[in-house]
UniProtKB/Swiss-Prot annotation:
Required for rescue of stalled ribosomes mediated by trans-translation. Binds to transfer-messenger RNA (tmRNA), required for stable association of tmRNA with ribosomes. tmRNA and SmpB together mimic tRNA shape, replacing the anticodon stem-loop with SmpB. tmRNA is encoded by the ssrA gene; the 2 termini fold to resemble tRNA(Ala) and it encodes a 'tag peptide', a short internal open reading frame. During trans-translation Ala-aminoacylated tmRNA acts like a tRNA, entering the A-site of stalled ribosomes, displacing the stalled mRNA. It comes from Idiomarina loihiensis (strain ATCC BAA-735 / DSM 15497 / L2-TR). Belongs to the SmpB family. This is SsrA-binding protein. The keyword Transferase does not apply. It is found in: Cytoplasm. Keywords: Cytoplasm, RNA-binding. Pfam families: SmpB. One of its GO terms (molecular function) is RNA binding. Its main location: cytoplasm. CDD domains: SmpB.
Length: 159
């Protein structure tokens, strides 16, 4: 008998599923996040929401806005916990320059899609994204439905 490997839990903490529906995701970047102690504890407990989050560039630095990290009930009373504060993103200069140049173009924005663990550090997956128009969203939905229907037809035709 072979030994069973212990199941590894997923490193993903939270996802922004709405981003794939709202944007054409183009370039992917991995950024570290500058967090306080209570935020790390809350993230470990899974009390994070990045569904409406986005990245802005201010004074040559990237900041995450709209991410909500709820403080734990056991949080220290001498520290003021602000769930909606802006958090600095840690990127290499070359990546930051690329984001600055691209975000200044018309119709492009920087969207956070996933927050996950990489070793002991919380990392944020961000994309350079272009907004979809409503007809693009409808086309995406039609294509997805057609793929589902095609798979269903192929499954039944094999029998």
């Amino acid at each position: 008998m072979s030994k069973k490997k212990p199941q590894q839990s997923s490193n993903t903490i939270a996802r922004n599923k709405k981003a794939r529906h709202e944007y054409f995701l183009e370039d992917k970047f991995e950024a570290g996040v500058s967090l306080q102690g209570w935020e790390i504890k809350s993230i470990r407990a899974g009390k994070v929401n990045i569904s409406d989050s986005y990245v802005i560039i201010k004074n040559g630095e990237a900041y995450l806005l709209g991410a909500e990290i709820q403080p734990l009930n056991q949080a220290s009373s001498h520290v003021y916990c602000e769930p909606d504060r802006s958090r600095k993103l840690l990127l290499k200069r070359r990546e930051l320059d690329k984001l600055i140049g691209a975000s200044e173009r018309e119709g492009y924005s920087i969207v956070a899609t996933t927050i996950y663990w990489k070793g002991p550090w919380a990392k944020l997956e961000i994309f350079l994204a272009q907004g979809k128009k409503s007809h693009d969203k409808r086309d995406t939905i039609k294509e997805r439905d057609w793929q589902r229907q095609k798979a269903r037809i192929m499954k039944h035709s094999v029998r």
